[in-house]
């Protein structure tokens, strides 16, 4: 079998680092950008990182995020200026001209805000350590996906939240204050009730220093289990080869995501589960993939060791046809023999919401019924499960596409409401 070449810095075209000429340390925290469509999430990521994460051709054409976007950025600190003016993403302080020092590097996960892309948002939320809820000051609050995204953060258990009141340059002071009170009323009684509300303009770079100060306070670097076997949630996968490349030039497939525990090095063996679907004589099964790490990138920086926190691009010796077009998204990678089992069905304990959010009429949520199809998000995986048995607080589902998940894993549950998948609750895998 042909052993594909090691990957080069072409990997960094897919997991971006800041537009400045920095030598970044590995990101230590993943921060999600969530909120309603066109409220400025991608523009804010660009203001903080210099990277425009909408690079897919359809995203450029339609002007909205479709896939998860990623960008790394350093939070720099001026040794002379007081807080919050000391914070910037520049190498020199915009206030006094002093050379700044790197405080920490973060990864941003830019989730789409369109209602039809809720599954993508939920898979991104699985790798977030905290989140920025972006709310436009020039529209009434809350908008439908503002409500749905906040409910998703609450259900998944993301408690470290900063609220950004964006586009303050487009409205009057009176409208900003009115919108602020709408925001505070909206988050009352939710996981974001005590989150700070930072008024900014991502387009004009207004109050970015105050926002970074809030992110430093509200979303600390989490502690990670580096003494465990390496385990990685795959959020993207790529074929980085250009059309027409000769066999000698072909490079192995790339997986992108975040380490949840353990340490990863070039040369380490990896198992990927559930793996690839194989059909023989009318019988279908999923076979785990085994490969070796050829290179690791944190943004554009090649590293010899990767630890949990932040986003990584991992080069492998896999046939790139296995990784092209996000085909391994939702799978798990880790030390062979240590990953959770592949599940074609499971029983989950149910915790349903009272009402459907994100729709015009917030209807009461009825109990889950046998034979009902549900969209299920487990980690970065999205699959459809058909309910094979249902009781008041428990349901068994048969999956259209298997997942690798442990007992106790959390499941975000959505059902079809008015031809759209709507979040209705959360489950916990029991068996």
Swiss-Prot record:
Family assignment from sequence similarity: Belongs to the TRAFAC class translation factor GTPase superfamily. Classic translation factor GTPase family. EIF2G subfamily.
Positions of Zn(2+) binding: 78, 81, 93, 96
Pfam families with a match to the protein in the record: eIF2_C, GTP_EFTU
Subunit architecture: Heterotrimer composed of an alpha, a beta and a gamma chain.
Location of region: G1: 35-42
Keywords: GTP-binding, Hydrolase, Initiation factor, Magnesium, Metal-binding, Nucleotide-binding, Protein biosynthesis, Zinc
HAMAP family referenced in this protein's UniProt entry, alphabetically: eIF_2_gamma
Catalysis: reaction(s): GTP + H2O = GDP + phosphate + H(+)
Enzyme Commission number(s) of this protein: 3.6.5.3
Job description of the protein: eIF-2 functions in the early steps of protein synthesis by forming a ternary complex with GTP and initiator tRNA.
NCBIfam families: eif2g_arch, PRK04000.1, small_GTP
Binding-site list for GTP: 38-43, 166-169, 201-203
Organism listed in the record: Methanosarcina mazei (strain ATCC BAA-159 / DSM 3647 / Goe1 / Go1 / JCM 11833 / OCM 88) (Methanosarcina frisia)
Residue ranges constituting the tr-type G domain according to the UniProt record: 26-223
Name of protein: Translation initiation factor 2 subunit gamma
Gene Ontology biological process: formation of translation preinitiation complex
CDD domains named in the record: eIF2_gamma, eIF2_gamma_II, eIF2_gamma_III
InterPro entries in the cross-refs: eIF2G, eIF2g_C, eIF2g_dom_2, eIF2g_GTP-bd, P-loop_NTPase, Small_GTP-bd, T_Tr_GTP-bd_dom, TIF2_gsu
Region of interest (G2), residue spans: 63-67
Cofactor: Mg(2+)
Cysteine disulfide partners in this protein: none
Residue stretches in coiled coil: none
Region entry G3, spans: 110-113
UniProt GO MF annotations: GTP binding; GTPase activity; metal ion binding; translation elongation factor activity; translation initiation factor activity; tRNA binding
Annotated binding of Mg(2+) 1, by residue: 42, 65
